[in-house]
Amino acid sequence: WLLEQQKYVFQNKKFYNYKTDYFGPLLDETGKIKSRRDLSTLDYTPDLMYIADVYGAVDDTYGYYDNSTAKGAGITVDDMSVISYAYENGATVVAEMELFNSGLDSSVYSQLSSLCGIRTTGWVGRYIYDLQDFTDVPDWAPPMYEKQDGVEWQFSGPGILLVSSDRIIILEQKTDFESKNLLTVRINKDFKKQFGSCNKVNFYNWFEIVEPNSGTDVIASFEFDVNATGMEKLKGVLKSPVFSAAMCKRVEGKAPVYYFAGDFNDYVSHENYNRFLFAESVYRWISYDRQGDISNFYWNFYNPLMKKIPSGFPSPAKSCE
């Protein structure tokens, strides 16, 4: 949406095309991987490389629960070579969660971790609007919990699900949190000047718990509004209810690398309005916090964040600075 609405173009002034400039798993109508457009076929060095949803949305565990990788999905050794080459030749890299699936080749894992400037913990989580709604709760969660704790799944209402390869934790709004703002995301103080247009908002999606390497800047943080009971459940997972959401690694002479520890770009806009001059302002104005609705996060946090990242890209309309 952003590339189209903001009129970003290649250096030859041609517009980006999400159908031809996308590489990775290609899905059929049922969401199954039907083929793959290999990154190795890329024949130019991009200004921006955005890496997300590398498993093709075929598995809502992100590989952490069943330790599997769908055939044709994930970052391959060849993909990593292209990514590294693009970065070394000036490309800005933006990556979202789920890159570090447990089935990843060890050399690729090491290179990705170094490139993004982060360390994984093996924990992912998700906001659940109603823990009794099994169209929203992942189907593997109740049996995993019941096997682990030996009791029936009897949770209800909004909550947070946390899972690793061998453990699951459920936090309920009614018992483990101070308010209905279970998980928020905000820009950190040192980056308010650059990203001040990003509002503090609730986050209602998948996220992961990662740790920044030394020298990696934490632009934004997640925060659980847990009470003492909730914090007790988080022992061994987090030392603090505040953890990294958006990070940036900068190396002198290289373009920055951004890592988002959440499913940030999970939103589909109304295509008919995309080219409308004031579309972004209208979307921000009509978006408000509705528990479980991701649109407010997209328009009041993610979109203004992304507008500040591709500064210097060719654009006939305007600069992002």
Residue positions per predicted region:
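Loop/turn elements at helix/coil->beta-strand transitions in domains of secreted/extracellular proteins
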Residues: 44-48, 88-94, 255
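Post-signal peptide N-terminal segment of secreted/secretory-pathway proteins
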Residues: 7-84
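Extracellular/periplasmic catalytic domains that process cell-envelope and extracellular macromolecules
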Residues: 41-44, 86-88, 211-213, 251-252
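Extracellular ligand-binding/catalytic regions of CAZymes and related secreted enzymes
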Residues: 1-17, 192-321
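A structural signal for short, well-ordered beta-strand segments and their strand-loop junctions
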Residues: 12-14, 50-51, 92-98, 259-260
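A glycine-rich, often tryptophan-bearing local segment used as a flexible ligand/cofactor-contacting loop or short
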Residues: 62-70, 74-195
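Solvent-exposed loop/turn segments at secondary-structure junctions
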Residues: 54-58, 93, 99-103, 223-227, ...
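Extracytosolic and intramembrane catalytic regions of membrane-associated proteins
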Residues: 36, 43-45, 59, 156-158, ...
